[in-house]
Amino acid sequence: MIGKTIHELRMGDVAEVIHQVDAEGVAELVDAVGDYNPIHSDPDYAASTPFKEPIAPGVFTAGLISAAIGTRLPGPGAIYLSQNLKFLKPVKLGDTITARVTIVEVLRERNRIRLETVCLNQRGEEVLTGEAWVMPSRESVVYPDRYINKPPLIDTSAPVM
């Protein structure tokens, strides 16, 4: 992984990560943050809700945006400054989520970029939209991929049309 500096970033640059949502990943996040809402882990309870089955916590999907920023664009060394989010559809176990970040503004003098953020499910439906402000590293950061314990993400850093 190579973190880009403000001078390497351009309007329209895009990066994605793709992740399949599974019960183990949801359980790990629920345990890590203490979000024991039964909508995320209890099929009997979830059956009584409008969703009819467990759904992933919103922060799970939002975390994929963080992964795209921290590992792809601008990459290692970036500081995530702010994020606004809209959760549009539930994310269910088995869904494959594509988190995409697109540079929509570059403020070189302030070392800031504004990103459009979106997560899509395997049907191409938007499940999350938002906007983030990020401060790229002032120096290019090279961080070996081998330090990633469990690479759940598929790199699709090729340009998206």
Each PLM stretch: what is its role?
Residues 2-11, 92-161:
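HotDog/MaoC-like acyl-thioester-processing domains
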Residues 1-78, 141-161:
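Hot-dog-fold acyl-thioester-processing enzymes
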Residues 16-20, 86, 133-135:
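Generic structural detector for well-ordered beta-strands
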Residues 72-101:
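Mid-chain, well-packed structural core segment of small domains
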